[in-house]
Amino acid sequence: MIISKTPLRISFAGGGTDLPSYYKTGYGAVVNAAIDKYIYVIVKDSFDGKIHLRTTENEVVDNINDLKHDITRECLKHVGILSGVEIISIADIPGGTGLGSSSCYTVGLLNALSAFNSVKKNSQTLLYTNPSVLAEDACMIEIDKLSAPIGK
């Protein structure tokens, strides 16, 4: 069982300058800080070989493409886990509060799935040894693959 704990964040200045429509044409700068509220992601083997997702909504699917939670589906595909996993997400604060919860979930999930893959393959190498690579992959999933209107 792998458990990740990822802090939520609060923005102080520069909101909007981290959106692609702005930073691709000019310079953007944002001041954020992590707070002491977290999103926890638990990843473990499923008992039946299916994909189990337990968030505010519960899903159990045989095929990864049937997973409705788009961030989870794309993170699983990105790290190459297509079945046999249970994912549980618990947050200190509900989504939609402006504290970056979707991005926090994406980072925490990618990190946990990477560690889970490493344990399953009995490997000493984690996919994400560099936090910048983890952040870039999380942005790629949310912004490029899912077209989420979020900042970078």
Predicted regions and their residues:
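ATP-binding N-lobe of GHMP and related small-molecule kinases
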Residues: M1-L99, S103, N111-T129
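Alpha/beta catalytic cores of group-transfer enzymes, especially the acyltransferase/condensing modules
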Residues: Y128-K152
